[in-house]
């Protein structure tokens, strides 16, 4: 009897235990499922803050905004600090490919950078003796500076010998840099300059069967569709008359400086001058390339059919496959494909608007067929041509210089009203993601120069606007993030811009470089703070629709002045941002920022309070929504910015 009862109880306990296990498993599975659904729901739902209610962070964005870091390769790794005007590379030093180390690349990547534009890599004209490896001398009278313009390319199938430890092995050293860059998770962009080349173009490195520019030209005529150059028949080239007390090499004696340069017949100059004697301010060190446009402007090549602005690059590629195109087009396609084979991920095209859009359709469709993810950037300054170069020319990105850059610079430098920002974005709203934003590059004056802002901190609100106002890529120029002034008298180059024509050191960059440690060891505290600001900002990826709230607040908000600029980004099912900037370097502002009804309705925010967190410095605030309108208490100091995210 007792044995029977014992066995019965034992079975019952086992049954109860089994039930407990099953219950535990089911409840935990349900909890896991519930928590998963709840967590996913948080990505797409916002709930007003209630009493004792915790704020849950959203999942981080998966995709990363493109950030380009422009390196002027000849200057980047240079440790020499003498900075003698017109100095030789032995005196003033020169950067090498090998100076761009894994450590340097990792520190650059930490800034939020995705792409590096290695500027000045193709072999260009320069004053130096490399005859021992088969390179002919360049005449200083048609070289700007001693180091030379990077946009007077002499050999498209090799790289600047100055950049190599072993100039005879220069191409291999560049390939190693490409691989090193890729190994550090970064993409490589390099220059192609289709509009013009050096007056003495001479490729000694071209693959077998590739002809030099002009090799088969008929130089007895001004124009032929298959000539690479335009000619001035029966007239020889004459050097320009120098101005402003200029002398080649600063007046230094040189065996090739004799007042003449042999070119007969003369060729048109790079900026389009048709005179056998260009002016001093012409691009006299270069010659204009012929893309099949006659001197009277006729296009002597096939035209894209109507509607092709809406077609894919694949369709453009198929269109050109059986078409006869000018010889110069063929040469540049060969050049681009050559560098793609070397591992380059994209190109920055110099003065792209001086070359017909049909050529870009031809070239860029071929590039995209080879590498659909290639990064294609055009230097262009004509807003009326923007859409053609994007849609017909298949450019990924264009310089946003004459609209956003100029507007922001005028606010920073000249105290212009921030009212000018919104009209720029309105004008570009259909192509805003195609516009590359920047506040510095090799052509522009340094922010920290006295000719621009003098103090680099004065441009930080502009940098915030530039980086966050759209999905466009952001570009910064090496040294910008540590307040480089570009104040040196380098020789040909003038102070305020870091010279691209001379051998020179870049002082603030050198302090960050710290003799190759790349740890900022010589930077001042202010420079360290500046770099940290850039690092925080460039790692922030703001997405979603841009809505201007500046003009609404100008009308409806007391104490909201035209030194402030506010806008929103975001989507109803995603992250939402309210961005506020104070461009004044002396005034603080205290006001109740209004979020108008169109934003609240677009975001579908119910009434209530919403926690805000600034992504720059983690300060907090509250968004109050009532009657389909929002408000935020803002107390903003001089040159301060908030990138508020609704948590």
Q: Language-model segments: what does each one mean?
A:
Residues 67-68, 623-647:
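C-terminal beta-strand-rich structural cap/linker in extracellular carbohydrate-active enzymes
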Residues 43-44:
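C-terminal motif of bacterial Sec signal peptides marking the signal peptidase cleavage site
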Residues 369-450, 457, 464, 468-471, ...:
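Glycan-recognition surfaces
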Residues 287-386:
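Active-site neighborhood of glycoside hydrolase catalytic domains
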Residues 94-108, 324-340, 459-463:
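Short, acidic/polar
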Residues 67-69, 116-118, 188-190, 347, ...:
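Hydrophobic faces of well-ordered beta-strands that scaffold small-molecule active sites
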Residues 438-441, 446, 450-610:
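Loop/helix patches that line or flank the sugar-binding groove of alpha-linked glycan CAZymes
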Residues 49-187, 195-206, 210-225, 231-273, ...:
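N-terminal structural segment of carbohydrate-active enzymes
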């Amino acid at each position: 009897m007792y044995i029977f009862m014992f066995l019965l109880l034992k079975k019952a306990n086992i049954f109860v235990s089994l039930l407990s296990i099953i219950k535990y498993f089911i409840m935990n599975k349900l909890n896991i499922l519930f928590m998963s659904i709840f967590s996913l729901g948080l990505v797409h739902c916002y709930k007003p803050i209630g009493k004792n209610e915790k704020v849950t962070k959203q999942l981080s964005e998966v995709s990363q905004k493109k950030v380009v870091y422009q390196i002027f390769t000849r200057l980047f790794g240079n440790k020499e600090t003498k900075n003698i005007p017109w100095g030789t590379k032995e005196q003033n030093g020169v950067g090498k490919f090998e100076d761009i180390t894994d450590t340097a690349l990792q520190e650059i990547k930490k800034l939020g950078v995705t792409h590096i534009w290695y500027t000045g890599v193709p072999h260009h004209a320069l004053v130096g003796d490399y005859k021992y490896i088969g390179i002919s001398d360049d005449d200083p009278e048609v070289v700007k500076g001693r180091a030379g313009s990077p946009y007077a390319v002499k050999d498209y199938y090799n790289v600047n010998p100055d950049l190599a430890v072993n100039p005879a092995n220069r191409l291999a050293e560049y390939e190693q840099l490409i691989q090193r860059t890729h190994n550090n998770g970064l993409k490589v962009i390099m220059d192609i300059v289709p509009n013009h080349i050096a007056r003495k173009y001479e490729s000694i490195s071209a693959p077998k069967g590739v002809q030099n520019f002009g090799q088969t030209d008929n130089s007895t005529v001004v124009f032929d569709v298959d000539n690479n150059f335009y000619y001035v028949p029966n007239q020889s080239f004459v050097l320009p008359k120098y101005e402003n007390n200029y002398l080649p090499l600063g007046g230094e004696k040189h065996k090739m400086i004799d007042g003449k340069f042999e070119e007969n017949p003369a060729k048109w100059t790079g900026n389009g001058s048709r005179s056998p004697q260009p002016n001093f301010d012409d691009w006299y060190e270069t010659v204009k390339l012929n893309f099949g446009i006659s001197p009277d402007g006729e296009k002597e090549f096939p035209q894209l059919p109507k509607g092709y602005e809406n077609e894919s690059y694949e369709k453009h590629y198929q269109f050109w496959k059986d078409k006869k195109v000018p010889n110069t087009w063929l040469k540049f396609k060969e050049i681009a494909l050559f560098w793609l084979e070397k591992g380059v991920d994209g190109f920055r095209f110099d003065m792209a608007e001086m070359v017909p859009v049909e050529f870009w359709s031809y070239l860029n469709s071929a590039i995209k067929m080879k590498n659909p993810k290639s990064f294609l950037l055009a230097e262009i300054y004509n807003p009326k041509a923007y859409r053609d170069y994007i849609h017909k020319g298949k450019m990924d990105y264009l310089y946003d210089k004459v609209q956003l850059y100029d507007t922001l610079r005028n606010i920073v430098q000249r105290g212009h009203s921030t009212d000018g920002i919104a009209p720029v974005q309105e004008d570009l709203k259909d192509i805003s993601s195609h516009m590359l934003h920047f506040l510095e590059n090799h052509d522009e004056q340094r922010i920290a120069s006295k000719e621009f802002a003098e103090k680099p901190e004065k441009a930080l609100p502009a940098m915030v606007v530039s980086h966050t106002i759209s999905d466009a890529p952001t570009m910064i120029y090496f040294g910008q993030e540590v307040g480089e002034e570009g104040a040196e008298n380098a020789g040909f180059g003038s102070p305020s811009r870091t010279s691209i024509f001379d051998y020179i050191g870049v002082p603030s960059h050198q302090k960050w470089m710290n003799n190759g440690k790349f740890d900022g060891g010589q930077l001042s505290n202010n420079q360290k703070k500046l770099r940290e600001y850039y690092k925080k900002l460039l790692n922030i990826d703001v997405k979603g629709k841009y809505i201007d709230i500046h003009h609404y607040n100008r009308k409806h908000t007391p104490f909201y002045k035209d030194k402030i600029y506010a806008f929103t980004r975001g989507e109803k099912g995603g992250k939402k941002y309210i961005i506020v900037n104070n461009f004044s370097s002396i005034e603080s502002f205290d006001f109740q920022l209004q979020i108008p009804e169109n934003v609240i309705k677009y975001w579908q925010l119910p009434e209530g309070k919403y926690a805000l967190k600034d992504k720059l410095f983690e300060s907090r605030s509250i968004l109050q929504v009532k009657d389909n309108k929002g408000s935020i208490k803002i107390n903003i100091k001089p040159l301060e910015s908030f990138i508020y995210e609704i948590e």
